C-alpha cells in the first residue's frame, strides 16, 4: 500500500509540474504547434477563423477554429485548406 501511495504521489507531482506537449517552448510565443494534420476536410460551415502556427514549430500548419472553439490542424499545402483560407479572407 505504501508503494502505491508513493507512486501515486510521484505521478501527481509530475503531472502538476509538467506542461502539455503542445505548449510552445518559447515564453513570448503562445501559438500552439501541431504534430499531425486532419486527414479529411472539415465542413466549411463549422469554421470561424484560422491562424498559422509559429515558424518555430516542427511542421508548418494552419489551425482552423470551429464554432465550438475546437482547434484543428491542417496541412497548408492541401488545396481544400488554401480554398478555406481564401474564403475566410473574403468574408
From Swiss-Prot:
The alphabetical list of record keywords is: Chemotaxis, Cytokine, Disulfide bond, Inflammatory response, Secreted, Signal
What domain of life does the UniProt record list for this protein's source?
Eukaryota
Alphabetical GO CC annotations of the entry are: extracellular space
Disulfide pairs here are 33-57, 34-73
Q: Name one GO molecular function term.
A: chemokine activity
Give any single GO term for biological process: chemokine-mediated signaling pathway
CDD domains to which the protein is assigned, alphabetical: Chemokine_CC (cd00272)
Q: Where in the cell is it found?
A: Secreted
Q: What is its main location?
A: secreted
Secretion signal, residue range per the UniProt entry: 1-23
Q: Does the keyword Amino-acid biosynthesis apply?
A: no
Pfam families under this entry? IL8
By sequence similarity, the record places it as follows: Belongs to the intercrine beta (chemokine CC) family.
Q: What does this protein do?
A: Chemoattractant for blood monocytes, memory T-helper cells and eosinophils. Causes the release of histamine from basophils and activates eosinophils. May activate several chemokine receptors including CCR1, CCR3, CCR4 and CCR5. May also be an agonist of the G protein-coupled receptor GPR75. Together with GPR75, may play a role in neuron survival through activation of a downstream signaling pathway involving the PI3, Akt and MAP kinases. By activating GPR75 may also play a role in insulin secretion by islet cells.
What is this protein's name? C-C motif chemokine 5
* Encoding gene (name): CCL5
Amino acid at each position: 500500500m505504501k508503494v502505491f501511495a508513493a507512486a501515486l504521489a510521484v505521478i501527481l507531482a509530475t503531472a502538476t509540474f509538467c506542461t502539455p506537449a503542445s505548449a510552445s517552448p518559447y515564453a513570448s510565443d503562445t501559438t500552439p504547434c501541431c504534430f499531425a494534420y486532419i486527414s479529411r476536410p472539415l465542413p466549411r460551415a463549422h469554421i470561424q477563423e484560422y491562424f498559422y502556427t509559429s515558424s518555430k514549430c516542427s511542421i508548418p500548419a494552419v489551425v482552423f477554429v470551429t464554432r465550438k472553439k475546437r482547434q484543428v490542424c491542417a496541412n497548408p499545402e492541401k488545396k481544400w485548406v488554401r480554398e478555406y483560407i481564401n474564403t475566410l479572407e473574403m468574408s
